[in-house]
Design a protein with these regions (language model features):
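N-terminal entry module detector
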Residues: 1-3, 91
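Leu/Val/Ala/Ile-rich N-terminal alpha-helices, chiefly Sec-type signal peptides and the beginnings
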Residues: 4-58
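Alpha-solenoid helical-repeat scaffolds
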Residues: 18, 33, 37, 74-81, ...
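N-terminal interaction modules that seed assembly of large macromolecular complexes
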Residues: 53-98
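Long amphipathic alpha-helical segments
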Residues: 83-152
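A very general structural signal that marks isolated residues within well-ordered alpha-helical segments
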Residues: 93, 160-161
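Conserved small/polar residues in nucleotide/adenosyl-binding loops
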Residues: 153-160
Length: 161
């Protein structure tokens, strides 16, 4: 096996490859893809990381329990929806303030395009309705100039509502 410099770079600097993928976002469609992918990644890392930490070595066995898997699926959609809301607001706030992108109504359009796609992919109806309600509530009061500089999770958690 022959290693060249490119292979070595991919192995040693994977973050460069990950971040360079999004460095050249030039269209609203690319923003949509970014929001969808990042929300999925955050929710997956958050939920499965939490479960693995809490259950320890038994986490593998728990994935054989159908009731447990059903509960994980419900939780997955709720965490994803919360991530989707935060990521959408963060991205459009950043674009508004830092890139002079004034079409903040696109946030609403993109959010519901993604949410409706996920509903067609089997999103839990309760998670869908809850996300719709929370997004609309926050959308009407968001300060586009400052949101991206605030702590992301300043709103009450789902269990507080």
């Amino acid at each position: 096996m022959k290693l060249n410099l490119k292979d070595l770079e991919k192995y040693l600097f994977p973050l460069k490859r990950i971040f360079s993928k999004y460095r050249q976002i030039r269209s609203v469609e690319q923003v949509k893809t970014f929001i969808q992918e990042q929300s999925a990644q955050v929710s997956q890392m958050t939920l499965y990381g939490y479960l693995k930490t809490r259950m320890g070595a038994k986490h593998v066995l728990m994935f054989e329990d159908k009731d447990f898997l059903g509960s994980i699926n419900i939780a997955k959609w709720h965490v994803y929806a919360a991530s989707l809301i935060d990521c959408t607001f963060f991205c459009f706030s950043f674009l508004y303030k830092e890139k002079n992108f004034s079409k903040t109504d696109q946030a609403n359009k993109i959010f519901f395009e993604i949410l409706n796609t996920e509903k067609a992919n089997g999103m839990n109806l309760d998670a869908y309705e809850n996300a719709t309600k929370k997004f609309n509530s926050r959308y009407s009061t968001i300060n586009w100039s400052t949101y991206h500089n605030c702590l992301l999770y300043t709103s009450p958690s789902p269990r507080d509502s």
